[in-house]
Amino acid sequence: MAYLHFSEDELAGRRQRACEKMAAQGLDAVLLFKQESMFYLTGYDTGGYSLFQCLIMRADGDLVLVTRSADKLQAAHTSMIPDVRIWIDKGGANPAHDVVAVLKEKGLAGKQVGVELHAWCLTGQRWDMVRNALDGFCSHSDATDLIQGLRLIKSPAEMEYVR
């Protein structure tokens, strides 16, 4: 059972607002790399914010987390993410291929995918891997502000939590 700082209803409302914003921007999915975005939408709390991990969210709210094996248990204990996929962290690994495999499985080939570009874990080298994997597979655009903008407006549950 996961320990969540906020109720599942609160998290579901956040994801619903994110999906509405995605629809308004013409996005079929987003690739979220910021730890704070993952926490905001799912409760996922990890110290691995500087390492490659990606929360994929389709416009219908479907979620998949692509992360290292070291973070699998953390995802289970701190989030409501139903589908956690592991990329193997070894020399020459390219987790962007794992992300694109999920996108393909989810029917997102040729679709519009937003990417949260301004994130600690998305270094220049890692962005090159992601961009090269996405190019020719789908259209992509910067969606850095998508979740960040939602986080600015606090819900009653958030206000109560900080009191």
Residue ranges and their predicted role:
Residues 46-48, 81-82, 129-132:
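Short, solvent-exposed amphipathic alpha-helical segments in soluble enzyme
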Residues 1-62:
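Terminal domain-start leader segments
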Residues 60, 64-98:
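Compact, glycine/acidic-enriched structural inserts
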Residues 93-163:
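Flexible, acidic/His-enriched mid-domain "rim/lid" segments that flank
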Residues 33-35, 68-69, 115-119:
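Structural motif
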Residues 41-43, 75, 124-126:
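Short glycine-/acidic-enriched loop or helix-start segments at secondary-structure transitions
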Residues 28, 82, 111:
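Conserved acidic residues
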Residues 4-6, 86, 117, 146:
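Short, contiguous strand/loop micro-motifs
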